[in-house]
Every structure is written in C-alpha cells, then in structure tokens.
Amino acid sequence: MTQIKIKRVYEDPKTVDGCRVLVDRLWPRGMKKERLKYDVWEKDISPSTELRKWFHEDPVEHWEGFSAMYRKELETSETARNFLTKIKPYKTVTLLYASKEPVRNHARILQQFLETHLGES
C-alpha cells in the first residue's frame, strides 16, 4: 500500500519522500519555482477558495468545521478520486504544504482521506 507523508515545502527534499506533490491552491510565499522540488502540483485537490478563506479568518475556532467541510469536498470530488488512482502505483507519496501550522492544515486532512481510501482498495 502507498505510504502518505506530509511535509512543509520549506523542508529539504529527501529520497525517501517518493513522489512529491504540492497540494496548496496558491504558490508558497517566498518560494522560487526553481527552488521547490516537486513532481506535480495538484492545486485542485486543495480546499475550495471559499472554504480556505473562511478557515483563515480564525483557524483555531473554525478547525472542526473546516475539517468536516473539506472532507465532504473530498468525498464528492472527481479530482480526489482521480488522484487516488494516480498515486496507487507509488510506494511513498509526500504531500507538500506551506502552512506554518503542523496540525491544523488541509494536508493532514487530505493525508487521512487518502490513507482511508487507499486502505479500502
């Protein structure tokens, strides 16, 4: 089964990262395109713009609601289903995100979603 890791875009790449996937809708601040080592940018699997903006108004207060709404977006997303199919051949996939918050960020929710659905297949 595919192992799903998450990592900030500002951390150095490692060979154990496997396929490195940028999962932010917006390009990371201060990161030059030639500096970021990634294999694919899957911005359409990130939260919708409206959901992202709402979450950033108050990340602590909105975390639980954001988590539930983003999971719902993923469950109904053809992009998410296609992404699951795309990553199955890889031994390791590392989801790259820019947030300074290691726990309350969309990459962690996406990681859980992917692990759950990869385990079902």
Question: What do these predicted regions represent?
Answer:
Residues 1-121:
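Residues lining hydrophobic/aromatic ligand-binding pockets adjacent to catalytic sites
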